[in-house]
Amino acid sequence: MKFPDLLRCSRAVSLARPDLPRNSPDVYDTKIPILQAITAKKCQRFRGDWGAKRKLPILKNRHISIQKFDTFEHQCAFISSDRFVRTLKRIYDLKLPVPLNDYEQISPYLLQKYNTFSSSNPKSRPTLPPGILYAKLKLLDSFSDSEKKRLSLVSFIQTKKVPLPFTYGKFAPDSKECLFGVSGVIAATSLKGITSTKNRYVIRSLNVDETGKTIPNITRENRSI
């Protein structure tokens, strides 16, 4: 197949490559997972037609990511992207608010838009378009005993270890914070509208409704809210 024909007919070739910022090459690894995923109709997947140069085996996957269009073994190298796509859909569905200082760095490269979040006065915030990133939630277990006593008198979010099917994130030991993916989204959005600063809120469990959305069960001073 000639490249012009491949370019016109291939979903994988026609995907625009993300323009990585030259001054910060690792920004995608630290802020948001980036992966190009393609899909195909069921009848095309049954034929192994994913719009690549070569046909692929019959797969149960609905999304894949092409790593190499051709190898020395005359094969098309690919990996499954189902977990990645489901994770991003869950994050977008929960509409995670974005810390303003993080958003300034990554905002030019975001595709889907949501409201930003900042604890500062709204009048002092710079005007920026909305975006989406990880939430920063302090972990109670990461503090010392004296800090735990001090924090017990103020409002904080304690995330319990619950089974989450799709979670991205990594620890930041220097700041005693954890950058959450889906779990951070759930904790952040579930406390929307709660303004009291005298209570402690704890995520006890997770439920899933008929549409597949995750609903956290939050308690306030041992009383369900």
UniProtKB/Swiss-Prot annotation:
The keyword Plastid does not apply. Component of the mitochondrial small ribosomal subunit (mt-SSU). Mature yeast 74S mitochondrial ribosomes consist of a small (37S) and a large (54S) subunit. The 37S small subunit contains a 15S ribosomal RNA (15S mt-rRNA) and at least 32 different proteins. The 54S large subunit contains a 21S rRNA (21S mt-rRNA) and at least 45 different proteins. This subunit is mutually exclusive with mrp51/small ribosomal subunit protein bS1m. It is found in: Mitochondrion. One of its GO terms (biological process) is mitochondrial translational initiation. This is Small ribosomal subunit protein L51-b. It comes from Schizosaccharomyces pombe (strain 972 / ATCC 24843). Keywords: Meiosis, Mitochondrion, Ribonucleoprotein, Ribosomal protein, Transit peptide. The keyword Ubl conjugation does not apply. GO terms for cellular component: mitochondrial small ribosomal subunit. Residues 1-84 form a transit peptide. Signal peptide: none annotated. Disruption phenotype: Severely decreases cytochrome c oxidase activity. Increases degradation of cytochrome b cob1 protein, and decreases synthesis of cytochrome c oxidase subunit cox3. Cytochromes b and c1 appear absent from cell. Abolishes growth on the non-fermentable carbon source galactose. The gene is mug178. Its main location: mitochondrion. It comes from the Eukaryota.
